[in-house]
Design a protein with these regions (language model features):
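Flexible coil/loop and intrinsically disordered segments
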Residues: 1-109
Length: 109
C-alpha cells in the first residue's frame, strides 16, 4: 500500500482550487491505496480516478483490478468530484472517529 492523495497535488499546482494548499496534507485527503493502482491514478482528477478505484478493462482487453479499500469504492460510486469541502468533512469524520475510539477504549477522558 501507499498513501493516496485523493485530491492530487498536481491539480492544486495547476488550478489552485483549494483556498489553502496545506489542506492537501490533511488526513481527509489521504487514503491507503494499492501501489499499482496509485501509480495508475496518480495526478488525475477524482472523476478520472474512479475507473482506477473500481477497476477497468484496458484497450488490449486486459482487466485491471480495482482497489480493495471499501471507502474509496463507496466514494467512487457516490461522488462526482472530491473538493475542498469533501477534504474538510472527511478530515473531521476521521478525527471524530478516532477520538470516539480512544474514549471507548478508556484511553481518553
Amino acid at each position: 500500500f501507499e498513501i493516496e492523495h485523493i485530491f492530487p497535488k498536481k491539480r492544486q499546482e495547476q488550478e489552485r482550487s483549494l483556498s489553502d494548499s496545506r489542506k492537501l496534507e490533511l488526513l481527509g485527503n489521504k487514503s491507503l491505496l494499492e501501489k499499482k493502482i496509485n501509480i495508475r491514478a496518480s495526478d488525475y482528477r477524482f472523476s478520472d480516478k474512479v475507473k482506477y478505484y473500481q477497476g477497468f478493462e484496458n484497450a488490449k482487453g486486459q482487466k485491471k483490478p480495482g482497489t480493495k479499500i471499501a471507502e474509496l469504492l463507496i466514494m467512487s460510486d457516490t461522488k462526482q468530484d472530491f473538493n475542498e469541502q469533501d477534504i474538510e468533512y472527511r478530515n473531521n469524520e476521521i478525527l471524530n472517529s478516532f477520538i470516539n475510539f480512544l474514549r471507548q477504549e478508556n484511553l481518553l477522558n
